[in-house]
Amino acid sequence: MSASSSSNACKLLLLGRCLRAVLLSVAIQFLLLTVFLLFVNFQLLHPLAWVTGTLRLVASWYTWFASIPLVASVVLYGVILCQQHLSERRYCPTRYRWLLHYGPRKVLFLFAHLLVGLLTAWLYTGYLHTDYQHLKYKCYGQDCISAYNVYLLGIGMTAGCYYFVSVHMRKEISIEFPIVEQSRAEKMRELLYASLAKSLLSSLLPTISYTAVFCLFGPMVCHRLSHILSVDMDERLDGFFGVVTNVRLLFYGYLLTAQILSNMHLMRCFYGILLSEDLPLVVTKPRAAFAHEQDITLVAGLGVFNVYVVQCLAAHHFYKLALRKNSPQRAEIFQLTEPGNRPASWRSLCDQCLSILGSFTEELTESMQKISILKCAQSLPMPKITESLTTSLMAEKVLLRQYNQKHGIRPIVSPSREVAVESPADGIRHFPNWCERVSTQLEQSLQRLLQRVPGIVYLFNEPEGAKTTFLLANSLPVVYMTQALAQVCAASLKEDPYGVVQNDLPAIIKAINKLRNELDKLSSVIGNIRISSSSFNVLRCAVRRSLYAICLSFCDYLDDLLPPGEELRQLQDLVCQE
C-alpha cells in the first residue's frame, strides 16, 4: 500500500469515528436539555409529576421541531472539529502567515461557537416563563421588547465566545492518550460527571462579567432593538439594581452558561475519546491469498506525515506493542521473511523510526540556531590562553564577556589586535565597491525605517524560538517512538533469535543521544524563551528514559557497540548517574 493510499485509508477510519462523535454530540443535547428542565421545573412535593412532566416535555413534538436549528449548528460544529483534527499542521513563521492560514478557520469556528450558544439559549428560553420565552411580549396592552430574553440570548453567545477564546483561539486541537486503559463506557461516564461538575464552577466568571457589561450597555441595546422592531421599551432591567436584584434571571443565566460550557467541552472530548482509540495496524501483512489488501502496516501509519493524529496513533500503537512481553505481535518484529530469510519487518520499522528521529533532530537543531542566547554562546570567541592567566581568572573573563555580549554592553577601549591581519597573496588591498556600500547602507536604513512602523515587526518578524516551540508542541510521536524503540531493543536480548536488532543498535543509540544533547542545550535557556515547559519536559524525560533503558540493557557491550570517545563516556556516565 502506497503512502497516499495509507493516508486515505486512515482518514476514512477516522472519518467514521468523527461521524460517531457527531451523533454523540447530537444525543447529548437532549440529555443536557433534560437536566436543564429538571432544574427549572423542580417540584419538591410532587417528585413523580416533576420527572414525568420533564420527560414529556423532552419527548414532545415541539422539542423535536424546535431543536432542529440547534442540531444543525452542532453538526456544523462537529464538521469543523473533524476538519481541524484531520488537517495538516503547518508551521507559520510569522503572525501574518498564521493569520492567512488559520485566520479563516478560526473565524468560522468562532461563528460556530456563537451559533451554538445563541441557538441553545433560544431553545432553552422556550421552556421558561412567558416573560422569558420571546423577544417581544405584551406589557400594558402593547408590544414591548423583553429585556429578560435579550439578557439570556446574549449570555448564550457570550458563553460560546468565552469557550472559544479560552480553549481554541491560540491553541491547536490535540488528543490525549489515557495513562490507565478504560472502556469507552467508563470514559463517557467519567467525562459526563466531571464536565457537569466543572461547568458549575467555570461558568461563574463569564456570568458575572456578562452581567456587569449588561448593566452598563443592556439598556442601550434594548433601546436600539425596540426602535428596530417598532415596539416599546422594557424598563424592568433599568439600572444596576434592576439586574442584580432579579435572582431568577441570574439563576437562569448561570444555569444556561453552565449548560453551554459543558456542552462544548463534551463535544470536544467526544472527538478526543474516539480518535484516541487504537487503529487496526499490523506489523507484517499476511501473504495468504485471502488476506485483506486494506490492512495498514505500522510503518505506513508512521509515514503519514500530513495527518498528525494518524502519526500519533501509530506511534502510540508501537509503544503499546513494545510493552507487551512475550506477545506474538511483538515477536513479528524479529521474524525473518519466508522465502528470503530477511528481517524485512524490523528493517522497514527501524529505517522509518530513524528517519523520523533524524529529521526531527535536524529541524530542532536548525531552529535552536536562531535563538539569540544559544547563538551568542556558540559564536563566543575563546580568549587566548597565556601563562600569566590562572584558571579562575580565565573563567571570570569568559563569564564577563558572555554577560556583556548578552546585554549589548560594548567595551570602552577597542580590543587590541594580537594577531596580524593577513595580507592578500598579490599584496594589494581590495576595497569594496562604493555602489555596493551605498546599496548596503540604503537597505539597512530602509529596514530600520520599516521596523519603526507600529505592527510591522509584530506581524512580519518571526518570534524568537517559534519554530522550536512548534516542534516541541508536535513531538508526541517522537515521545512514543523513542520509548518503543528502547523497549524493543531491551527485549531483543531474549526475544530476538536471529540478532536482527543488534546490527542497528549503534545507529539507534547515536540518534537518541544526539537528540538528548540538543535537548540538554535547550534546557539551559528554557526560561528565557516562550516554550511550553510541559511538552519539553515530557520529550526530554522520554528521551533520557529511553537512552537509559538501552544503555542499562547493553551496559556490558557499550565498548563493542560504540567507538571510544566522548559519546561513549557520556553514555557510561548516564548509567552510573542513574
From Swiss-Prot:
Record topology, Cytoplasmic segments: 1-21, 82-106, 166-200, 261-578
Nucleus recorded as keyword: yes
Segments in the Perinuclear space topological domain: 43-60, 128-144, 222-239
CC per GO annotation: endomembrane system; nuclear membrane; nuclear pore; nuclear pore transmembrane ring
First-listed, main subcellular location of the protein, grouped into a coarse class: nucleus
Annotated membrane topology: Multi-pass membrane protein
Classification via Pfam families: Ndc1_Nup
Any one Gene Ontology molecular-function term assigned to this protein's record: protein-macromolecule adaptor activity
Modification Phosphoserine occurs at: S414
Keywords per UniProt: Membrane, mRNA transport, Nuclear pore complex, Nucleus, Phosphoprotein, Protein transport, Translocation, Transmembrane, Transmembrane helix, Transport
Subcellular location as annotated: Nucleus, Nuclear pore complex; Nucleus membrane
Transmembrane annotation, as ranges: 22-42, 61-81, 107-127, 145-165, 201-221, 240-260
GO terms of biological process kind: mRNA transport; nuclear pore complex assembly; nuclear pore organization; protein transport
Function: Component of the nuclear pore complex (NPC), which plays a key role in de novo assembly and insertion of NPC in the nuclear envelope.
Similarity comment text for this entry: Belongs to the NDC1 family.
Annotated protein name in UniProt: Nucleoporin Ndc1
Native species: Drosophila melanogaster (Fruit fly)
Gene assigned in the entry: Ndc1
